Amino acid sequence: MRIGVLTGGGDCPGLNAVIRAVVRKGVATYGHEFVGFRDGWKGPLEGLSRPLDIADVRGILPRGGTILGSSRTNPFKIENGVERIKDNLAAQGVDALIAIGGEDTLGVATQLYELGVHVVGVPKTIDNDLGATDYTFGFDTAVNIAMEAIDRLHTTAESHHRTLVVEVMGRHAGWIALHAGLAGGANVILLPERQFDVDQVAGYVEKRFQHQYAPIVVVAEGAQPLDGQMVLANQELDSFGHVRLGGIGQWLAEQLEAKTGKEARTVVLGHIQRGGTPTAFDRVLATRLGLQAIDAVHEGDWGKMVAMQSTDIVRVPLAEATRELKTVPLERYAEAEVCLFYTSDAADDKAR
């Protein structure tokens, strides 16, 4: 069997580990051939590919990014896009596709499967917001990067007696903000799942200063104040209809400085959260997902996504995985609140 592999959407630590596992087992165990399509769905759309063999994936396990490149190309927004993909797969003798990506990439995979393309999906997103899987690779790396940044920011915030607002990724789900904020000892965590009252946040900040400690506020890029307005970097939409978020951290810092009279600064972690070497957890998870994906292809189990449920790697229908996003349950946020800030004058310990 000749199998195509592609990576779509934002880059993510662990992508190369998936590619490596797929190719190594596919060649050594099953004797399959592989072709890597470049730059997401743009590859099969335009026939852009490269050969993939065991020698091509040697040494890529610890590397961030993806050796195949990526893009946010949506073939369903391009004239004759589906027909072009089918024609290029046939021209290159590709019998099946393994698509590694998030909600958009796997959404395309779901539609192509329904149109007769043999496809298996592998979930990828640092946001950890894909349904039907407990964890996605890249999330653990992003959380560790954000946590280390928060750890470092505590000392500079306290040295200068200022509020530091740390903006992390998370369009619709605040998993990174919640986990990194808790692990880094943040005093306030703001998620897309729950609108926040900026006056209440200012009150928490003032109480922190009353105890002679400088506050750290962690905010997901998709968090919204009570008026429900997202802060956007610009009004442009990508090929999947997403706006570009950015600026909630700066807006919040300005509001807090005005309301508390204390200096507030913003740190936007941005793309650093999804760059560089994956953690051990993400390398192992990505490898296990890749091994299960090539098993599914070999067995002809099309239209499935491999997923982590509890500690097991299972297969679920692609349609189920892309039906809805996995957001942070409010009870998870509620159980964390006791660790975030103090409301008692007797509380004089640091939050971490």
Roles of regions detected by a PLM:
Residues M1-L45:
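N-terminal phosphate-binding or glycine-rich loops at protein starts, especially the Walker A/P-loop
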Residues R2-G9, T66-S71, A96-A99, L164-E167, ...:
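Short glycine-rich or small-residue beta-strand-to-loop segments that form or flank ligand, phosphate
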Residues V18-V22, E103-V117, A177:
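Short Gly/Thr/Asp-enriched flexible loops that form oxyanion-binding sites at enzyme active sites
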Residues P44-A99, D104-T105, F137-N144, E148:
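Glycine-rich oxoanion-binding loops at beta->alpha junctions
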Residues A96-G101, A109-Q111, F139-A157, E167-K262:
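Accessory alpha-helical/coil subdomains and C-terminal extensions
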Residues Y113-V143, L190-R194:
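Short, acidic/small-residue loops that bind anionic groups at enzyme active sites
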Residues R244-S344:
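C-terminal non-catalytic interaction/assembly regions of soluble proteins
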Residues Y342-R352:
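Single conserved hydrophobic/aromatic residue that forms the stacking wall/gate
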